[in-house]
């Protein structure tokens, strides 16, 4: 049996793939030549055996044109090929045409033509069909076209094998949605792959919508060796504005090209991401197309040689391969553009009309007018259908908005420069010494302001093009009806720039203004309201979104940059790709929009506060640069590893907030950042900011990715040693207790940007702690109880430890040490107390040198004094001893004299000195001993036994 490769690539419509293109003629010894000659031999044998009986005894019938088809062989090295006839399956016949030389391999027909294989000439496509010539197109996505494949992977190589993860990626894929195909919404990496073989250089073109930077979207091309082509250097696809389609085109080389549309979602919270949408994929450069393709339902082609099918207008429809569109019965049926059938008109309800207010007339009156939503699809003549309310009721016009006045006409005009008005009175000049606070404040919605516009957009169709997405309603503006449930109802506010007050001129990094709006959403099904900002017409970024029914509330967004802003509100009833036209949900409403610059006195107060704080934290001057902290890692539900990265700038520098966080989601934005573009919108600057970092190994990218940058602190509240300031409290057990007695210094900040979770904005507290063990910038940490830096998502806490946070040194922080006296001189040194809990301040005094006396001199003096004292004591002892001897002698003599006169008559006692007595001796008797007496007694006590008692002879007569 003889097998040949499939035929050449065919252009297609409605998303059907073309066959792979073929090469041409091979050398005579090649397999292609062998196959051709073998086929010719078989055909000759079949022709010669035409009269022979078949296996059933009957000859084979001759082959008709319907019994076979033509195909080309593979191309040889010279670019030639053969056209051969291939019998259709289950057909037995004889007499196939002989092989003939085919067209060159690079041959192709023009758009609107196809290659008629019998004569090998290009022919125009008939009515109801179309052809791209050498291209293929995929514009119908009711199902995944043949040739396309989905490959879902989880590229995190750190967490572990896929079977250990909580959820796999088996259910993640690109989903066909009719007119477009939609990417995955989870954090899996899903590739939409299509392989094509080109005979000549060509290109690939597709339209896409990519509005959410929480999804990475890349398009690249590989060859048959799985090597990326040079043309995929810039594989990251640019973001588009919300509700708008962008286009992407890449040149293709001849040969095999494998096309990849790859998306990776980054889910760090509960908020769902918006998927990437792709439609109208066109590939140019295939060899030829051998047939024209019928127009898809809802389109038609009324001319031969068409390369595109036209869309059927409203209230018409068409089937596949239509030459024209068929009109619906407009009395009872309707259809949208590009419909394949007509639908019955439903009865009219209150959701099928809206009211508007006419401009004020000269009498100050406005009329309430009721109109059907266009195009009108309902019927008034059915049972239970309502009628359109009567129009023309007059009411008093609301006053002008603040800053505008009524000059007697039917419209409001802005106040001249230097004047102001609350909207109800004439414009007045500002008092002396004051300036007008410029801004817009829309409180009354009688007519749409001149700098606002409204529109309707649908990603899959044009049903609501030309409709008003929002309608004014007196004291508020509300979303319109739209044409489908998944329409985007868009309201734009354009601001060419900001003019800060004179008192703020020259301030850098300051709050230039803010926009505040009050809104509520009333939804009976799934709905979402987006608030988006575009700076200098670069790209629209979603700032905040609210899903489902929300009560009346206010939201504020702060502006720090003087640039051209476009603020956008987009309301969508459902974020799924559906084409429901009969359901019309309740609207969302906005009551007021305030767009005002910051008041001058607030900015002046802030400058004074920073001035006083600067005097108190002089010791922190070396911490004026940005401190950084990366904590984690954390993991998503499917195991994606990520980190929280914080930048902290305590006081900024010359009014600039140095803490900057960026989103380098694509190579394109990285190039913008490197180029220093002032319009780089993926960059935020503040006192404290946060980014989500995804390491390179986590998703298979060549570099770490930074996304979801948010401002945590843009307003400095104050600095104090207290733990509470303006309702921001730092609990005592949040951080470890400081080992020193030095109090911690606390910096308090606030962010004016509010979110659905933080209605009062975010706040930040930074605890500065003196730690001599951490020099330089030190280290930043978060509470152990709140590893993400916050426990509620609204208040963030940081502990910054550094020696630079220590107080200034004083004379109480050092002590002196005296050295030894050497050669009459002595040194005094000064050293810091340990541990040293201070920095800078006063310096250590220089060492002091003073005169002194040595120890030898005083030793000699002491010895001399001691010797003198000893001699003196010996002399005194001898003196008192001699004195004591004399006293004892006199006492003994007195006693002897007294005893010798006992026998004599008593004589008169006399104290007088007798003649011949010596007056030099005097004896005094005292009952109380003196100190010397006591010493003498002690000295003579042992000598009492040395004296003998002698009986003296009495001089008295015994007879007396």
Swiss-Prot record:
Phosphoserine-modified residues are where? Answer: 949
Tell me where in or outside the cell this protein is found. Answer: Cell membrane
Instruction: Indicate what this protein is called per its UniProt record.
Output: Endosome/lysosome-associated apoptosis and autophagy regulator family member 2
Any keyword Transmembrane? yes
Which Gene3D superfamilies does the record match to this protein? Tumor Necrosis Factor Receptor, subunit A, domain 2
Cytoplasmic topological domain ranges are 882-960
**UniProt record similarity statement:** Belongs to the ELAPOR family.
Provenance organism: Bos taurus (Bovine)
Q: Which domain of life is it from?
A: Eukaryota
